[in-house]
């Protein structure tokens, strides 16, 4: 038996394949197959349909009833069901509706997928008969137009090498398509269309309404939140204004209190300054200006005055008279006054503090007792006061007349300043001493 070997000239076959198919890239993977006594190049990649098939499918797509026929072709050729994304571009150019409902596409895909499992005798039928039958058939309603989106994926899988097989179609499949159309028409209830599609549209409209309501609710919630935030901002502004007003009122109160305090302090300082000026005027030969020095001078001046008064008190006879007045039993006819008692107590205290001086000391050394004319005048006044006190107490001593007293007072400064003999002053001062002794003798 002779074996026939095919000619391995790939140029002719490649030329034929390039005429049937589009231009193939150089790096494409190709498989060698034996068909009808010839070697055929078959690519392992997904095949693109030829231009003729696309034009034929575009013509059939304009008639919605051809979807069932194209689906029947896919039943006969299940190997070419895979399709690239680029093959569906021509089918997208004729969308039936502006908005494709996903519920209808899912329903149609499930519904027509059950047609693939139908089986039966096949009878060839020409394309002219199918076209006439499609012209007589009623066009599907608009709600089923989404089924067309399912058809291109199956129709686009036909290869260019099997174009001659598309001229014949089984009659049984066309009859089944008629039955399916009748079922769809009867289930739709006349010209009202498919109730499921209408329900889907109603559900879509209901979902759109609910979405609108949700949007309105969200917008209302946003407006409420914005209004609440505005209210919160206004409340915070009011609080800040209230805090500022309270701070201002507190600051004004503090400033007023400070002003009042300053005024009172100024008045007090003015009073102190006035009193210090008066005290400075009382102190002789005071040239100090500060308060501390003025007060020191005033204290020293008061101490000196106190010492002078003590010396004058001890040198005069007022101490003995006060001591005698302290005992009320000496003078039963005279009531003791509180002023006299106070003087007697002071004299006793002073006598206890200071030792009793000899009365001859002023006679021998008159300069120790009276060192200046002012002290001499004070001593003369003390003598006059002692005489008045003695008269008040009831004992009236014999005193020289007032003219003689003035003479003695005038002579004492002259004698002391002139450093004369002490006889004159002793004779002049002996008279008051004798009167005092006589007075004490009478009392005893």
Curated annotation (Swiss-Prot):
Residues recorded with modification Phosphoserine: 437
Ranges of Polar residues composition bias in the record: 155-171, 224-244, 424-437
Gene3D superfamilies: Helix-loop-helix DNA-binding domain
Subcellular location as annotated: Nucleus
Recorded superkingdom: Eukaryota
Effect in UniProt of substituting residue 38 to A: Loss of binding to PHYB
Induction info: Down-regulated by brassinolids (BL), but up-regulated by cold. Follows a free-running robust circadian rhythm, with higher levels during the light phase. Rapidly induced by light in etiolated plants. Up-regulated by white light. Rapid degradation after red light exposure (at protein level). Accumulates to high levels in the dark, is selectively degraded in response to red light and remains at high levels under shade-mimicking conditions.
Involved in interaction with phyB: annotated segments: 26-39
Tissue and organ distribution: Mainly expressed in leaves and seedlings, and, to a lower extent, in stems, fruits, flowers and roots.
Complex and partners: Homodimer. Interacts specifically with the Pfr form of phytochrome B and with TOC1/APRR1. May form a heterodimer with PIF3. Interacts with PHYB, CRY1 and CRY2 in the nucleus in response to low blue light (LBL). Interacts with TOPP4. Associates to PTAC12/HMR/PAP5 which acts as a transcriptional coactivator.
Name this polypeptide is given: Transcription factor PIF5
Source organism (scientific name): Arabidopsis thaliana
Lineage of origin: Eukaryota, Viridiplantae, Streptophyta, Embryophyta, Tracheophyta
Gene (name only): PIF5
């Amino acid at each position: 038996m002779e074996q026939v070997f095919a000619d391995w000239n790939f140029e002719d076959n490649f030329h034929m394949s390039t005429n049937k198919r589009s231009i193939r890239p150089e790096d494409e993977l190709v498989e060698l197959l034996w068909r009808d006594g010839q070697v055929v190049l078959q690519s392992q990649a997904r095949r693109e349909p030829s231009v003729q098939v696309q034009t034929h499918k575009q013509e059939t797509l304009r008639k919605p009833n051809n979807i069932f026929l194209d689906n029947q072709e896919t039943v006969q050729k299940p190997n070419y069901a895979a399709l690239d994304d680029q093959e569906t571009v021509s089918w997208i150019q004729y969308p039936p509706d502006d908005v494709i409902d996903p519920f209808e596409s899912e329903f149609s895909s499930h519904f027509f997928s059950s047609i693939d499992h139908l089986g039966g005798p096949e009878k060839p039928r020409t394309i002219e008969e199918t076209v006439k039958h499609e012209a007589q058939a009623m066009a599907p309603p608009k709600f089923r137009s989404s089924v067309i989106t399912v058809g291109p994926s199956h129709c686009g899988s036909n290869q260019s090498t099997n174009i001659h097989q598309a001229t014949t179609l089984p009659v049984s499949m066309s009859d089944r398509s008629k039955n399916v159309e009748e079922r769809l028409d009867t289930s739709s209830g006349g010209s009202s269309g498919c109730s499921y599609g209408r329900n889907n549209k109603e559900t879509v409209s209901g979902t759109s309404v609910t979405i609108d309501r949700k949007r309105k609710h969200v917008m209302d919630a946003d407006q409420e939140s914005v209004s609440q935030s505005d209210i919160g901002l206004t409340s915070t502004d009011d609080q800040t204004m209230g805090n500022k007003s309270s701070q201002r009122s507190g600051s004004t109160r503090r400033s007023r209190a400070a002003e009042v305090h300053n005024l009172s302090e100024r008045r007090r300082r003015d009073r102190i300054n006035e009193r210090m000026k008066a005290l400075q005027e009382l102190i002789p030969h005071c040239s100090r200006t500060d308060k501390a020095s003025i007060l020191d001078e005033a204290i020293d001046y008061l101490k000196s005055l106190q010492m002078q008064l003590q010396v004058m008190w001890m040198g005069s006879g007022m101490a003995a008279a006060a001591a005698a007045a302290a005992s009320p039993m000496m003078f039963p006819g005279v009531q003791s006054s509180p002023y006299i008692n106070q003087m007697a107590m002071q004299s006793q205290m002073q006598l206890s503090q200071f030792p009793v001086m000899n009365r001859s000391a002023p006679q021998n050394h008159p300069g120790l007792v009276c060192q200046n004319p002012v002290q001499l005048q004070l001593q003369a006044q003390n003598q006059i006061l002692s005489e008045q006190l003695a008269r008040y107490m009831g004992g009236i001593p014999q005193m020289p007349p007032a003219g003689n007293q003035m003479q003695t007072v005038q002579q004492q400064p002259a004698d002391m300043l002139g450093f004369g003999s002490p006889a004159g002053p002793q004779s002049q001062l002996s008279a008051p001493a004798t009167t005092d002794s006589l007075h004490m003798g009478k009392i005893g």
